[in-house]
Amino acid sequence: MRLADVAERFGATLDCPEHGDRPVLGVAPLETATATDISFLANPKYTALLQTTQAAAVFVRPDFQGEAACPLLRVPHPYLAFAKCIEWFYPQPKPVAKIHPTAILGADVVLGAEVTIGAYTVIGDRVRIGDRTVIDSHCTLYDDVVIGSDCRIYSHCALRERVQLGDRVILQNSVVLGSDGFGYVPLPDGRHYKIPQVGTVVIGNDVEIGAGTTIDRATLGETTVANGTKIDNLTMVAHNCTIGENAILCAQVGLAGSTHIGNHVVLAGQVGAAGHLTIGDRTVVSAKSGISSSVPPDSRMGGIPAMDQTLYLKVSAAVKQLPDLLKRVRKLEAKVGE
């Protein structure tokens, strides 16, 4: 592969066409790239690395003006170009469509074309699986599960009764969809009476769910995740939550029951949301924040309890001054007491 081929494939402008015959064998970060690797610059904080990188060339924005030790490939979206370059150089192996002899299929299962089912996977009755979907080993699909086309379900996932997946859904290892919601009636004698959880979970198209994440079935109706949303590892979504389109939930987010997340919302790592509230479209919440009330669209929030991000930064700065302020207050109290 030549550098000129990379430029042509990704519609990039090569700053130094005379280097077009330079060989390209892979992709790598700026700091570890070798003379045959393509790299990228998307975050300005790493601009200085352009002067020391050994990369064959680097994807940058068209308006980039800095110095570089290698040729530059100018594209509108360097990070996206880099991602597609990875796909090009490291294509994913296509599984051989087959049903492993140790897999167990229930009655009236409907399989689409080129479906793959791995070893020791158990498929319940009346399950429907779309074309080209791959289900790895040791997965369990309970009765009446519906899975769309081109999905990838990695090992040890469990999909409970009536769970539905759209097309091109990715479930990383040990995802659990449709476990019972956490619902109990407190009794006068202190015991807790379990409320039957008879709803389900519905996942839209192009959703990816990270390893160890759990999404509980609705008490009645549906817990839903809309098209294009990405959920990181070890996230908890409780019963009757709804998550809009193209949202991002980072690792260890926890949503209590009946939390409603809008479209294009970003919840950073370990954000927690109390139940029965709404987080409006395009809202961004910083890491470890606690959301205790509904948030309007286009908000920027942080802190516990979550507040406007600008106020949160001021409060955080003020907290660092508290020890000195406390000393000053004590001195003033001592003077007043004299």
UniProtKB/Swiss-Prot annotation:
Keywords: Acyltransferase, Lipid A biosynthesis, Lipid biosynthesis, Lipid metabolism, Repeat, Transferase. InterPro entries: Hexapep, LpxD, Trimer_LpxA-like_sf, UDP_GlcNAc_AcTrfase_non-rep. The keyword NADP does not apply. One of its GO terms (cellular component) is carboxysome. The active site is at H239. GO terms for molecular function: N-acyltransferase activity; structural constituent of carboxysome shell. It is an enzyme of class 2 (transferase). Pathway: Bacterial outer membrane biogenesis; LPS lipid A biosynthesis. It comes from the Bacteria. Its EC number is 2.3.1.191. One of its GO terms (biological process) is lipid A biosynthetic process. It catalyses: a UDP-3-O-[(3R)-3-hydroxyacyl]-alpha-D-glucosamine + a (3R)-hydroxyacyl-[ACP] = a UDP-2-N,3-O-bis[(3R)-3-hydroxyacyl]-alpha-D-glucosamine + holo-[ACP] + H(+). Homotrimer. PANTHER family: UDP-3-O-ACYLGLUCOSAMINE N-ACYLTRANSFERASE, UDP-3-O-ACYLGLUCOSAMINE N-ACYLTRANSFERASE 1, MITOCHONDRIAL-RELATED. Catalyzes the N-acylation of UDP-3-O-acylglucosamine using 3-hydroxyacyl-ACP as the acyl donor. Is involved in the biosynthesis of lipid A, a phosphorylated glycolipid that anchors the lipopolysaccharide to the outer membrane of the cell. NCBIfam families: lipid_A_lpxD, PRK00892.1. Belongs to the transferase hexapeptide repeat family. LpxD subfamily. HAMAP family: LpxD. This is UDP-3-O-acylglucosamine N-acyltransferase.
